Amino acid sequence: MTRTDGDQWDIVSSVGFTALMVSSFRALETTRTEPLIRDEYARAFVEASGEPRLTEALAAGTPESEWDTATVYLVNHLAVRTKYFDEFFAAATGSGIQQVVILAAGLDSRVYRLPWPDGTVVYELDQPKVLEFKDHVLREEHAVPLAERREVAVDLRDDWIAALRTAGFDATKPTAWLAEGLLAYLPGAAQDALFENITAHSAPGSFLATEWRRRQATAGQWQDAVNKLKPEFIKDISIGSLIYDDERQDPIEWLREHGWQVDTANRLEQAAAYGRPAPSEHSDVTSLWSDAYFITATR
């Protein structure tokens, strides 16, 4: 799954497969007695993909008490991230925002599972084949969006702002932007361009959320960490080959320098606050997250 310039993917290949893995862990979280989040569509996405490793893992129905440490770690990791950004949207829409942009939306189902104020429009941007798969599954599930959903099939390394405008985006209105689980999959120049475009098209009152590790890990470090954390059913997947570890600006500093009011939440501290602390068995891996932050910003 090595990256190349201009590479494309569907839901079972390259970066698309990571969205499917995220869905599998959200599906597992949803089966818990006291889940942090509930995503009733996550299982449907995995099952519809036909991807044997993930579908078999869900079909096994292994009770939470028998999950291995790696599964617990990853399910917790995704549940904490999902809940944090769910709360971000609650705060943004609570301020009166009715325009939402989810970048690299993947199999995000927030438009179907979160309460949205009347009149909210949610734009979902991702690769064409990913959105095609997602739309098919949601139709099969007879899913009803709780806000107006507009899909924008575009590569975020291309002129995605033009595609967003064509879909009806209004830069004069405040916007809630989400870049969840995205930055590591962009080259440094594309990340910089992403924040430049967001800033240039954010009216006063806009919100932004993303995540960042202030001490960037190399692709090799990531692969070592992931290898220790991967459950048996995805041991052969090379996540490290999908990320970019080239030089880039720290978005926390960049956003502050460009007029955003920035707040951060340490990822490990947030996990503990939600009652999902990192397992002590992987202290060396956990250290990679010790300077990882959720970022929320307003302007």
From Swiss-Prot:
Record keyword Transferase present: yes
BP GO annotations: methylation
Keyword annotations of the record: Methyltransferase, S-adenosyl-L-methionine, Transferase
Residues annotated to bind S-adenosyl-L-methionine: D126, D155, L156
EC number(s) given by UniProt: 2.1.1.-
InterPro entries: Ppm1/Ppm2/Tcmp, SAM-dependent_MTases_sf, SAM_mthyl_Trfase_ML2640-like
GO MF, one example: methyltransferase activity
Family: Belongs to the UPF0677 family.
Function: Exhibits S-adenosyl-L-methionine-dependent methyltransferase activity.
Database matches in PANTHER family: S-ADENOSYL-L-METHIONINE-DEPENDENT METHYLTRANSFERASE YKTD-RELATED, S-ADENOSYL-L-METHIONINE-DEPENDENT METHYLTRANSFERASES SUPERFAMILY PROTEIN
Annotated protein name in UniProt: Putative S-adenosyl-L-methionine-dependent methyltransferase MAB_0027c
Organism name: Mycobacteroides abscessus (strain ATCC 19977 / DSM 44196 / CCUG 20993 / CIP 104536 / JCM 13569 / NCTC 13031 / TMC 1543 / L948)
